[in-house]
């Protein structure tokens, strides 16, 4: 049995993670901690893998503390910048088990979203134009979503490798309506009551358009991906920092 501790256990995602861990045949809940709880309760004696689902403002400190405890961590919190990732890598290198420490960060745990992202990177080189639209519930704290940013980076890298010119755009004034530009790709965020988590990637050429869309209607859609990551970290996942569930899928 894989002993799993959950940080952010009383949050929207954390509650689902606790339930998923309790219901899976090969995992058992070790500790369920939330804001204000002492993370040093989590040790390698009582925990094999930690799942961290909190908020961007505290996630980095949580992960650094857990690395210091020598436990492997699955992170579902978004808002990770290059600077924050560099701090995680440094903490691993200087932590108690630099050769075996595993930290996994996923922009999205929904299999549909991971596949949509993968398909988008494959399609990117064939189209002159590309834009990303992400749609979420109005209580989401970050915009654009980490998934959308990750998708935009992947599209940009594929376009660069193919030698494509920048996407065409004659806009001179927009007042912010053209969204955030991520590596030359426009990313738009919608926050609307009734939505959960959705993403559309639009590709265009003269006379044609391709739309790739992923919809998560309920947070239970993320749990198979979370459990996959837990099992991989408890098993054959490589040491160090891994980003993206695609690394654990046969793509």
UniProtKB/Swiss-Prot annotation:
It comes from Bifidobacterium longum (strain NCC 2705). One of its GO terms (cellular component) is cytosol. The gene is dapB. The keyword Translocase does not apply. It is found in: Cytoplasm. Catalyzes the conversion of 4-hydroxy-tetrahydrodipicolinate (HTPA) to tetrahydrodipicolinate. This is 4-hydroxy-tetrahydrodipicolinate reductase. GO terms for biological process: diaminopimelate biosynthetic process; lysine biosynthetic process via diaminopimelate. GO terms for molecular function: 4-hydroxy-tetrahydrodipicolinate reductase; NAD binding; NADP binding; oxidoreductase activity, acting on CH or CH2 groups, NAD or NADP as acceptor.
